[in-house]
C-alpha cells in the first residue's frame, strides 16, 4: 500500500461501494471502503489516506459533517459524491472544506480522472497532511498586498504578521490571483488553472472556494467583477 495512492471511500450503498472499490483497485489505487460516517472517521484517523471520497448522505455522521471533521484535522483532498448536482448539499460540502464533487451515478473513468486531477493539484500521488501545490506564481519570493504576505517559495501566507492556514486548493487559488493582481480571472479560467479541468466544470466550486478564501485573507481582498469573474486588489 505504501507505493499506491490510498483512497478512503465512504458510501452506505453496498452495491455502489463494492463496485467502485473494485474499479478503483483495477486502476491501481489502494482502497479502504467504509459504510458509514463514524467508521469512515475512525479509518481516516487510523490510516491517514491520500484522498477521501465521501457520499453526502451517510448514516450516523453525514458526509458534510465528516468532511468538516476531516478538515479540522488535515488538508487531505476531499471529493464529495452527491446524487443531485443542484443539491444544496453540494454547496454545503464545498463550504465544509471539500475540494471538488462528483455527481452520482458516475462513470468509473470520470471518477478516476477527477481523483487524478485533484492529486495533481496537490502535487503528489500520495502523502497526507501537508499544504503544498504546484503554484500558479512561478517566481519566488514574498508578494505583499497591504497586510497580506504570500510566500511563494515556502507556500505560506500571513495576514497582519499572523500565519493563515490554507488548504492546498485555497493556496493554489491565491497563487493564481497573486500572479496577476488587478487582472480579472474568469471562473472558467480558474477551473482550468486551479482545478486542472480539461472540460467544463461547475463554477460553484470556484465561488465557494473564493468565499472560503475571503474569510481567511479578508472579505474585501478579492473583488467580484460581475459578469466576468474575480480579481485580487493590487
From Swiss-Prot:
Gene3D superfamilies: 3.40.50.2300, 6.10.250.690, Winged helix-like DNA-binding domain superfamily/Winged helix DNA-binding domain (1.10.10.10). GO terms for cellular component: cytosol; protein-DNA complex. GO terms for biological process: regulation of DNA-templated transcription. Coiled coil: none annotated. The modification 4-aspartylphosphate is found at residue 55. The keyword Cytoplasm applies. Member of the two-component regulatory system CseB/CseC involved in the stability of the cell envelope. CseB activates transcription of RNA polymerase sigma-E factor, in response to changes in the cell envelope. This is Transcriptional regulatory protein CseB. It comes from Streptomyces coelicolor (strain ATCC BAA-471 / A3(2) / M145). The gene is cseB.
Amino acid at each position: 500500500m505504501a507505493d499506491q495512492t490510498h483512497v478512503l471511500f465512504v458510501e452506505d450503498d453496498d452495491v455502489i461501494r463494492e463496485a467502485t472499490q473494485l474499479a478503483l483497485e483495477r486502476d491501481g489505487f489502494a482502497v479502504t471502503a467504509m459504510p458509514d460516517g463514524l467508521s469512515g472517521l475512525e479509518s481516516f484517523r487510523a490510516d491517514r489516506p491520500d484522498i477521501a471520497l465521501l457520499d453526502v448522505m451517510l448514516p450516523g455522521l453525514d458526509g458534510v459533517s465528516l468532511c468538516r471533521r476531516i478538515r479540522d484535522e488535515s488538508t487531505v483532498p476531499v471529493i464529495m459524491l452527491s446524487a443531485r448536482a443542484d443539491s444544496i448539499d453540494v454547496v454545503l460540502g464545498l463550504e465544509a472544506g471539500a475540494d471538488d464533487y462528483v455527481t452520482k451515478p458516475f462513470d468509473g473513468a470520470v471518477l478516476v480522472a477527477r481523483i487524478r486531477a485533484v492529486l495533481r493539484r496537490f502535487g503528489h500521488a500520495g502523502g497526507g497532511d501537508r499544504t503544498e501545490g504546484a503554484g500558479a506564481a512561478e517566481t519566488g519570493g514574498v508578494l505583499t498586498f497591504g497586510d497580506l504576505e504570500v510566500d511563494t517559495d515556502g507556500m505560506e501566507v500571513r495576514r497582519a504578521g499572523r500565519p493563515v492556514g490554507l488548504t492546498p486548493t485555497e493556496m493554489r487559488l491565491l497563487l493564481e490571483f497573486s500572479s496577476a493582481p488587478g487582472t480579472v480571472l474568469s471562473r472558467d479560467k480558474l477551473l482550468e488553472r486551479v482545478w486542472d479541468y480539461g472540460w467544463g466544470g461547475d463554477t460553484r466550486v470556484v465561488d465557494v472556494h473564493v468565499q472560503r478564501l475571503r474569510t481567511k485573507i479578508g472579505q474585501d481582498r478579492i473583488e467580484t467583477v460581475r459578469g466576468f469573474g474575480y480579481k485580487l486588489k493590487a
